[in-house]
């Protein structure tokens, strides 16, 4: 522990030392008064005012050495140091100042608030009465200020069944075994995206393996597809770029999604929510980039000549992969760096490059909406085929879709794409909802954020909505005043 820097005489006189230089000078007075034979700081070569690490390495102010120092009071009496030590939480709470040697150096960092209060800190929930408290306590006493602006109090890591890990029970998961088996990035991304950091995490090795296969495997395969054909064609990014406005709609769509992704990920990170940010990247890579864009555009990479259409496909996919490598860097620092360098990034490392910023001019919300409609309808039709065991290769005459006027507009724009994907000849709209019975299924994760403790009451009411009420809800949405729905 840190010795209390207080010396007191038997008569009650005392002095609180505020710096090593002050202690040095007080020892000199004690030597002159005959209470000390010599100044141990001077004997060890310490030079007051020299803030170098080398200078401070010469002395040790821990016990028992500091207890040998006798000071002299103003009345000429000997003073001995108080025997108590400062609680270690005082040391921890002094971190913002001690780490920069304030107030002896770097005064502007604290006084002009360049590095204080901290933007963000993170520790386990057990630190609520420890570090979190002492940081604020000391900052309030000294500066009448909070010590930090944002905090994430991490939950506990439990086993896959939600039980506390225990060596006695035998359910402890060795993190080094997980890293060795699945890789550091897979473990990191799993832990960040599986649950919010402030919630307890049910750690399941199968979940880590799923992240490794479904996310990193998909991203690697997407890069491999690009690299295979790019190397054959001698594609060089940045040469003879196709103007954005002249690119096919599918290219403009994925680039719009990419820039929307940048906006959303940045917003979530600035809001200190890495879980939602990581899930957004995962959804883009798996759903939009791999399962939709690359799958629908494979043939564009197969042509023998480097046509404008083929070059546009290369440029678009390259931009997506390069941007994802930079977006992914905080979540998966190793693979993102590998991907960045494989793509020929300008910097020596992705971590030396700037984090992506969205280009608003490339975002087309209307285009994204109608393509999302195509994805949803395709997914539902294919799911229905699987349910009734009708293979995709077997053509069907028509599909019937209930839709609002706005939805019809979007669907008409991507009608041919949908029909081709699901192998159906006609797409017809259902007028009215007479033949449909709709049910409300609540997304509790989303509702929890919106309604909090009111969520159960809202869910109970929504489960009992009539067909007319459901239609009204679809058209008008949930009221802004959340209490009005309870």
Residue ranges, per PLM feature:
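Residues forming anionic-ligand binding surfaces in small-molecule and nucleic-acid pockets
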Residues: 114-115, 263
């Amino acid at each position: 522990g840190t010795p209390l820097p207080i010396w007191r005489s038997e008569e009650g006189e005392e002095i609180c030392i505020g710096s090593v230089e002050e202690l040095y000078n007080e020892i000199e007075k004690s030597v002159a008064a005959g209470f000390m034979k010599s100044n141990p700081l001077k004997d060890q070569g310490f030079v007051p005012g020299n803030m170098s690490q080398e200078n401070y390495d010469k002395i040790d102010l821990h016990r028992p050495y500091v207890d040998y120092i006798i000071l002299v009071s103003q009345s000429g009496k000997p003073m001995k140091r108080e025997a108590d030590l400062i609680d270690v939480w005082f040391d921890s709470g002094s971190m913002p100042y001690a780490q920069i040697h304030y107030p002896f150096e770097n005064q502007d960092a604290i006084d002009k608030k360049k590095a204080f209060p901290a933007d963000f800190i993170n520790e386990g929930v057990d630190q609520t009465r420890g570090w979190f408290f002492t940081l604020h306590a000391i900052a309030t006493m000294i500066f009448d200020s909070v010590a930090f602006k944002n905090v994430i109090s991490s939950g506990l890591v439990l086993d896959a069944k939600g039980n506390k890990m225990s060596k006695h029970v035998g359910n402890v998961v060795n993190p080094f075994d997980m890293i060795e088996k699945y890789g550091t990035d897979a473990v990191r991304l799993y832990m960040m995206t599986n649950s919010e950091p402030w919630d307890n995490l049910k750690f399941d090795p199968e979940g880590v393996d799923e992240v490794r296969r479904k996310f990193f495997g998909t991203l690697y395969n997407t890069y491999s597809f690009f690299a295979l054909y790019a190397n054959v064609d001698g594609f060089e990014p940045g040469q003879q770029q196709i103007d954005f406005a002249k690119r096919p709609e599918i290219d403009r769509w994925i680039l719009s999604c990419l820039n929307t992704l940048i906006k959303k990920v940045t917003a979530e990170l600035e809001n200190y929510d890495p879980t939602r940010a990581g899930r957004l990247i995962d959804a883009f890579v798996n759903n939009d980039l791999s399962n939709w864009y690359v799958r629908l555009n494979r043939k564009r990479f197969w042509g023998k000549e480097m046509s404008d259409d083929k070059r546009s496909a290369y440029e678009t996919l390259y931009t997506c992969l390069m941007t994802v490598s930079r977006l992914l860097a905080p979540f998966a620092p190793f693979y993102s760096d590998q991907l960045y360098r494989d793509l020929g990034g300008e910097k020596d490392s992705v971590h030396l490059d700037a984090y992506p910023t969205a280009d608003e001019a490339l975002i087309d919300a209307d285009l994204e909406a109608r393509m999302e409609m195509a994805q949803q309808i395709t997914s539902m039709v294919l799911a229905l085929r699987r349910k009734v065991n009708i293979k995709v290769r077997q053509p069907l005459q028509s599909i019937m879709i209930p839709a609002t006027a706005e939805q019809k507009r979007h669907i008409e724009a991507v009608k041919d794409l949908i029909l081709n994907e699901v192998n159906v000849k006609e797409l017809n709209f259902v007028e009215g909802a007479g033949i449909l019975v709709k049910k409300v299924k609540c997304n509790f994760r989303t509702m929890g954020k919106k309604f909090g403790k009111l969520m159960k009451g809202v869910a109970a009411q929504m489960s009992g909505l009539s067909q007319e009420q459901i239609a009204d809800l679809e058209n008008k949405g949930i009221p802004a005043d959340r209490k009005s729905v309870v």
